[in-house]
């Protein structure tokens, strides 16, 4: 897992989420504020994350609710504009995530130069979005066709708002996912953004695949990050950086700094 330190400059990295507000075509897009407001808000939140000392950032269309499993082209185009307008200000490694579409995530990575993506790329799930099917072979072939062999894949095997259809132990899912798909990172999530990752499940996954990186994907807090990083190889963190730790609120610099001070004290 030497690539983790090479990519993020540290072991056990904290990847901060920059949750982009609703975009054109999304039901809750602010048409009065327009894309200019979306970009301005993304810039404010990104700069707070970067100044707060996070190791990397991941831009996602987090407010494109309700989510699609096949993202519309306008959404990817608007996300490319957001990242493109911020690109000159980005001084840390960054990734992208188009919820919930790995193909669109790869397309956005190709457009922006992102170093990693995160998505659901294997398994079949009963979810809030309907029956959720995947095709990892086609996804990885799309990655290679786009010339993105160096883009790291953060592979979520416990997706939010969904349950694996087959009655298989999580250890078995982790092992076969690694064997069949060679993911760079396995992500373990809670039930929604901001919901705690079950540390027992996290430990079971890590014990099952000790030579593969495992990241906690949701719900990391100042009070829990020490325990989480005692198990995981890194964490994706978003909601806890926001005012009062609430999903709908905006990132606060002081919360980011306090969290990262804690991380620096334990790693």
Show which residues each predicted segment covers:
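Active-site mouth loops of central-metabolism enzymes
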Residues: 19-44, 94-101, 155-171, 216-221
């Amino acid at each position: 897992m030497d690539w983790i330190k090479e990519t993020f400059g540290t072991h056990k990295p904290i990847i901060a989420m920059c949750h982009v507000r609703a975009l054109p075509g999304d039901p809750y897009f602010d048409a009065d504020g327009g894309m200019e407001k979306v970009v301005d808000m993304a810039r404010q939140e990104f700069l707070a994350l970067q100044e707060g000392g996070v190791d990397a950032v991941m831009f996602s269309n987090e407010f494109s609710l309700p989510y699609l499993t096949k993202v519309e082209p306008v959404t990817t185009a608007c996300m490319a504009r957001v990242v493109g307008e911020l690109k000159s200000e980005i001084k840390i490694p960054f990734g992208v995530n188009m919820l919930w579409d790995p193909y669109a995530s790869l397309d956005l990575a190709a457009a922006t130069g992102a170093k990693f993506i995160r998505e659901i790329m294997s398994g079949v799930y009963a979810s809030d979005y309907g029956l959720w099917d995947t095709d990892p072979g086609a996804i990885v072939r799309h990655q290679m066709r786009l010339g993105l062999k160096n883009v790291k894949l953060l592979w979520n095997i416990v997706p939010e708002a969904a349950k694996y259809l087959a009655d298989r132990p999580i250890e078995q899912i982790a092992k076969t996912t690694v064997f069949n798909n060679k993911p760079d990172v396995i992500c373990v999530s809670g039930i929604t953004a901001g919901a705690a990752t079950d540390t027992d499940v996290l430990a079971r996954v890590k014990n099952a695949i000790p030579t593969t990186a495992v990241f906690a994907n949701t719900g990391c807090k100042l009070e829990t990050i020490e325990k989480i990083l005692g198990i995981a190889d890194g964490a994706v963190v978003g909601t806890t950086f926001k005012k009062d730790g609430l999903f709908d609120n905006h990132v606060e610099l002081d919360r980011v700094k306090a969290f990262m001070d804690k991380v620096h004290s334990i790693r």
